[in-house]
């Protein structure tokens, strides 16, 4: 699942050079994202299908993202950002600074994971396609980023 989380983070960091330029900060953020706790709250099994409710506890990346977004808007409106500002660099510096500064795991979200038994009798999950689970593991950042993109239209 480490590769999956790196892929999720990479989708947030779309510039190929960012991971290289901010290698230390990028690595720190990946490790922070992987540092989540979980607790199985409930499970319901019905033959070859099951639903497991899991509470994820992690860092509040969503709030850090929202604060970063608000700061970018404020700086743009105040004239701090000019045509000479490298916006990507400005945003990535702020993103890594805000997210890597998080110290407490105070974000909690309970999600449902769908499971099915395969022909070998092993359980498989929907974790690869479960956007609620990804959002929980990313501390609500997907929810808040979609709210920001909707509200800025």
Each language-model region and where it sits:
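Intrinsically disordered, low-complexity acidic Ser/Thr-rich regulatory segments
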Residues: 23-30, 88-104
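Core segments of small alpha/beta cavity-forming domains
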Residues: 1-39, 63
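Residue-level signal for tight coil/turn positions that link beta-strands
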Residues: 45-49, 119-120
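A short hydrophobic beta-strand element
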Residues: 48-58
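Proteostasis/folding factors centered on peptidyl-prolyl cis-trans isomerases
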Residues: 39-44, 51
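Hydrophobic membrane-targeting and insertion signals
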Residues: 47-49, 145, 151-153
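Short beta-strand edge/turn micro-motifs at domain boundaries
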Residues: 75-87, 101-149
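Short, cysteine-centered beta-strand-loop-beta hairpins and adjacent loop/turn segments enriched
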Residues: 57-72, 103
């Amino acid at each position: 699942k480490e590769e999956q989380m790196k892929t999720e983070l990479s989708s947030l960091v779309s510039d190929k050079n960012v991971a290289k330029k901010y290698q230390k900060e990028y690595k720190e953020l990946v490790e922070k994202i992987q540092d989540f706790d979980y607790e199985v709250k409930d499970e319901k099994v019905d033959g070859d299908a099951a639903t497991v409710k899991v509470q994820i506890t992690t860092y509040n990346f969503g709030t850090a993202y929202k604060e970063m977004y608000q700061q970018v808007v404020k700086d743009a409106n105040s004239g701090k950002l000019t045509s000479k500002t490298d916006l990507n660099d400005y945003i990535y510096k702020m993103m890594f600074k805000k997210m890597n500064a998080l110290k407490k795991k105070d974000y909690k979200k309970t999600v449902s994971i769908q499971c099915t038994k395969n022909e070998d009798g092993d359980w498989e999950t929907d974790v690869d396609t479960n956007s609620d689970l990804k959002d929980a593991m990313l501390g609500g950042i997907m929810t808040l980023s979609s709210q920001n993109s909707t509200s800025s239209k």
